[in-house]
Curated annotation (Swiss-Prot):
Gene3D superfamilies: Dihydrofolate Reductase, subunit A. The gene is ORF2. Belongs to the dihydrofolate reductase family. SUPFAM superfamilies: Dihydrofolate reductase-like. This is Putative Dihydrofolate reductase.
Length: 210
């Protein structure tokens, strides 16, 4: 199993990720396509695990649960059995990672993806493991009531596009957005990166005034 923890999230200009327990903006096909591609891409003969909180699970339309082609794990400290459709229940992110490393699943899983919500993102982004963060930046303010914390992103730097690739702003339904990738910056992870992916500082994308 890949030791890196992968996170995928969409944020508005103030790092908002939710409003009234729903996605704050209309569904963006390009973002949904990228989410599906990221979380399903895996080594032959394996699957990825997607880990989410109970509210995130319930926010997925019933007809789309579980997320197809992925091992769905729901986190809850109050439930005693997995919610209908979920494959596994875990009490914490650590417990979910332990499940992924268990004899039952270790040979089946390629990557572990964290897909929400806010508290789980914070735990994932500030934990001791290597992290790669795939972020959709929605270039509008949607007056959200759930946010990614700036503190949890302080250790992250943006990965430069590869030669020949160009940052692109997409537009759907009058909404502009773009895709970005970040890594947790440590001495070992920074020096291990090839020059073409040398990270750049996370500011201004994660600044208080963004």
């Amino acid at each position: 199993m890949d030791p890196t923890l992968y996170c995928v999230v969409a944020v508005d200009t103030k790092l908002g990720i939710g409003k009234n327990r729903c996605l704050p903006w209309p569904a963006l096909r390009g973002d949904m396509r990228r989410f599906r591609q990221l979380t399903t891409d895996c080594a032959p003969g394996k699957q990825n695990m997607v880990v989410m909180g109970r509210r995130t699970w319930l926010s997925i339309p019933a007809g789309c649960r579980p997320l197809a082609g992925r091992i769905n794990v729901v986190l809850s400290r109050t439930l005693e059995t997995p919610p209908p459709g979920a494959h596994f229940l875990a009490s914490s992110l650590d417990a979910a990672l332990g499940l992924a490393r268990s004899p039952e699943l270790a040979q089946q899983i390629d990557k572990v993806w964290v897909i929400g919500g806010g508290n789980l993102y914070r735990e994932a982004l500030t934990g001791p493991w290597p992290v790669r963060l795939f972020l959709t930046r929605v270039l509008h303010d949607f007056a959200c009531d759930v946010f990614l914390s700036h503190d949890s992103l302080a250790a992250y730097a943006r990965v430069n596009p590869k030669p020949g690739e160009q940052e692109r702003v997409f537009q759907e339904r009058g909404i502009f957005y773009m895709f970005e990738t970040y890594i947790k910056v440590t001495q070992s992870s920074d020096t291990a990166l090839p020059d073409l992916e040398r990270p750049r500082p996370a500011t201004p994308p994660f600044s208080e005034t963004s």
